[in-house]
């Protein structure tokens, strides 16, 4: 952990401990945390689109893990608000398991368009939900090609929790790494965000309240981080 300007920055290991405290000790379900994370992502997407998503095109890049599940929740909410949503399944639907797979079933039942990688994206906003804080090393295929395509598209990118390809603990960008205009990070920021090399990948950083218990914030000496709102701009 590092402490900067009244805010705790956690390593990937410490963030995992915070999640385990919420899930294993206090009984908050993975599904609840995923719902909250995706909802906050969708709320920030709406803000970035001028406060109105109806008729606007949003493409969500979805990986196999819980980060992808967060993206699927965000896709559902933007769709419900009238957005024109496309979900790109980076590794196919069969790669998703457990909570993300359940989210995908709901998305498909709602009639949200799901596609395989490839082709040209036409969107006002891309949502990067490919890799989460547990990822290490440079992304491999097929994710690497998706990341390069996203960066090359010139469509503004909102990263879910952290830009895919960025090491949460060290802040070392992989090859490739998403170049986001905005990042919605969940709970507390990661130590890697303090690395100057990481900051061009992160863009504007927002902290999103996903209902991690108060004990998490008290443990890291910043209990009031969301006292004035559930989406807080850090820089």
Feature locations, PLM:
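Generic, low-specificity signal for short hydrophobic/alpha-helical stretches with a mild N-terminal bias
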Residues: 4, 15-19, 23, 27, ...
């Amino acid at each position: 952990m590092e402490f900067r300007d009244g805010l705790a920055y956690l390593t990937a290991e410490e963030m995992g401990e915070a999640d385990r405290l919420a899930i294993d000790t206090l009984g908050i379900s993975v599904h609840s945390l995923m719902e909250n994370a995706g909802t906050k992502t969708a709320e920030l997407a709406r803000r970035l689109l001028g406060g109105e998503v109806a008729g606007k095109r949003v493409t969500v890049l979805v990986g196999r893990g819980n980060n992808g599940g967060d993206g699927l929740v965000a896709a559902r909410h933007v769709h419900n608000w009238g957005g024109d949503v496309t979900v790109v399944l980076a590794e196919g639907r069969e790669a998703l398991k457990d909570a993300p797979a359940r989210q995908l079933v709901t998305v498909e039942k709602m009639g949200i368009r799901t596609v395989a990688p490839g082709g040209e994206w036409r969107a006002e906003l891309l949502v990067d939900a490919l890799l989460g804080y547990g990822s290490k090393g440079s992304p491999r295929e097929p994710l690497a090609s998706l990341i390069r395509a996203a960066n090359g598209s010139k469509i503004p990118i909102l990263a879910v929790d952290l830009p895919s390809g960025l090491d949460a603990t060290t802040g070392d960008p992989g090859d490739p790494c998403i170049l986001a205009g905005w990042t919605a990070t969940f709970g507390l920021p990661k130590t890697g965000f303090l690395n100057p090399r990481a900051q061009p990948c992160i863009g504007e950083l927002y902290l999103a309240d996903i209902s991690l218990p108060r004990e998490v914030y008290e443990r890291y000496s910043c209990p009031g981080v969301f006292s004035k709102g559930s989406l807080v701009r850090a820089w």
